[in-house]
Amino acid sequence: MSVVGFDVGNENCVIAVAKQRGIDVLLNDESNRENPAMVSFGEKQRFMGAAAAASATMHPKSTISQLKRLIGRKFREPDVQNDLRLFPFETSEDSDGGIQIRLRYMGEIQSFSPVQILGMLLSHLKQIAEKSLKTPVSDCVIGIPSYFTNSQRLAYLDAAAIAGLRPLRLMHDSTATALGYGIYKTDLVANSSPTYIVFIDIGHCDTQVCVASFESGSMRVRSHAFDRNLGGRDFDEVLFNHFALEFKEKYNIDVYTNTKACVRLRASCEKVKKVLSANAEAQLNIECLMEEKDVRSFIKREEFEQLSAGLLERLIVPCQKALADSGLSLDQIHSVELVGSGSRIPAISKMLSSLFKRELGRTVNASECVARGCALQCAMLSPVFRVRDYEVQDSYPFAIGFSSDKGPINTPSNELLFPKGQIFPSVKVLTLHRENTFQLEAFYANHNELSPDIPTQISSFMIGPFHISHGEAARVKVRVQLNLHGIVTIDSATLIEYHKENITSEEMISEENHQSSAMKDGSLDPSSGSIGNEPKAIKRMEIPVVANVSGALTKDELSEAKQRENSLVEQDLKMESTKDKKNALESFVYEMRDKMLNTYRNTATESERECIARNLQETEEWLYEDGDDESENAYIEKLNDVKKLIDPIENRFKDGEERVQASKDLLKTIADNRMAAESLPPPRKNAVLDECHKAERWLHEKTTEQESLPKDANPELQSAEIRRKADALNATCKYIGKSNSPPAKPEHNGSYGSRKSDDMELD
């Protein structure tokens, strides 16, 4: 069993695997370490990764990318609408307010949710891992942005289930980076006090910042901060808008009106950005951008930095917020690490160096650090790996509260159940006085931390039904968990009834102020007094809990999505097999045409050559016309038809070559047996020599007969016949050589024609 870490980025994906000697990043079929996060739909087949990226320019409306911007989101969210205006593919709103991606596939318009598309991408990454490792892949850790909401995290788990993966954890990107950094940095724990490191991850579509502390054998994330809408693609968009305006004035073309032109210009702008990261200036040249017009332009790094000034200023905000939430001063920070695909712009490094008053570190691989950290975490969680003890404490970036039909539920100190910065996984136990079915709701306590129009409600839980015999002497204990994935769940609800006379009014939980006690698992209810005075329970009963979780697929929906994915995989495999058979037929036609003109020319008659040449030409024309899009069986039948004509000629040629070698082998067998016969008694020696002479004479006669025939005639002497003769000679000579008595001479017994031989004894 393998343990794998997946970094599913907005632009690219990276796969890392934990091995005994360390962490390795896997290569795809193109020998690249990064896999484009794209899924493209052809007429009858899907294409993933690099194959999808290759078709993005030609088929933009059927190529899906930037899934992280859509997963677990609602169609009408402002951020989603801003993104959809940039995407070339068609979308619509489903019945639940979610997003549906519409495209043409298998001759009809089909709809897919972002969860289904992500499931396809994860399935592709899983296939790459299994092909490289030559073993099934199931257990994994998947990196996610720290700002993902509960519904987005659930969507990732659903997508992983569709792909046949079992995530042991959804891990924050920056936490994974910190783990991969800290577990190898033994110098960080030289001092007795913690070492504080800031990690800034500027990705394709977002910026994440975290402050982590490192001690001997452990790390803790003290704060997370982020800008959901600031990444490398925004700097690309600055260049795109600049050149689009310039081309409108210079060439009188409006690229905004042409989908393919937009895709091509954005791809070129990304290349220009990379050139400007290492050079002071860059050129842009695109042939036939639109209206058959070639465009060219030029930009300097200084101009690009001026155009990006607003974006650079926005980078300061999450950095300052992360530092403030950590409660640390700038002087306490040991170092600052900069990672992410968008971190290579010189102006970004310069601005952040000025902010933190130090040079930025780049000691981790900017593109692979998340995947490597996820693989490490997977190894720690998997039972099949032994990893040295290293504790990872992550913090949750949102404050989560609970409420019931009687009002908000807080801790005895009047705090939220899971305040912002809560270390998770975390379990709290609520002790409530209820007499019948009730409902709990989980919600984000601060809507300002969320994107606009994202609902604050997370999920609701119906607890019950249940029946109690002593109403005033019963309590319901609810076990609430913020689990390893950062998802809010209720593990269990238990009804506990006590002896009525053992319960005083002070021992009951007062809910007049709409509060209940909340404590960590295993601690005492503050209202219950000491352990010795705790009333004795007379009845415990598990209460059913029904969750209504926003953003999660139901069991039926998940099962249907899995079945649909399986059918799509079967179709892909069918098309790949059909493509292989078509390529095999095409290769066979070209190969045989060449051999008929050269290798097989002398072994075929004139009429055979003409017939085969005509058939090969007809097959080639069929391939490029009527047979361009045929079934797998059609290609197999065509190949068999051509082979029926070729096989006799091919057999003549091959048998002619093999006949020469078989003759040499028979002559060697004859020589070997003659040499072995020298050590035998005279009668057996003569018998062996006689058999060798017969075989030699047979070969000479047959060879002479064969050589008298033309090369294009069917052979009279076949190589298989010669090999059988050699085997028979060996067997006969071996039989004679092992006999205990010599062969008997013929004797006259009665009449002249009557002969009798002695029986031979075998060893």
From Swiss-Prot:
The keyword ATP-binding applies. Pfam families: HSP70. Residues 509-529, 701-763 are annotated as: Disordered. Keywords: ATP-binding, Chaperone, Nucleotide-binding, Phosphoprotein, Stress response. SUPFAM superfamilies: Actin-like ATPase domain (SSF53067), Heat shock protein 70kD (HSP70), C-terminal subdomain (SSF100934), Heat shock protein 70kD (HSP70), peptide-binding domain (SSF100920). It comes from the Eukaryota. Residues 701-714 have a biased composition (Basic and acidic residues). InterPro entries: ATPase_NBD, HSP70_C_sf, HSP70_peptide-bd_sf, Hsp_70_fam. The modification Phosphoserine is found at S528. GO terms for molecular function: ATP binding; ATP-dependent protein folding chaperone. Belongs to the heat shock protein 70 (TC 1.A.33) family. HSP110/SSE subfamily. This is Heat shock 70 kDa protein 16. It comes from Arabidopsis thaliana.
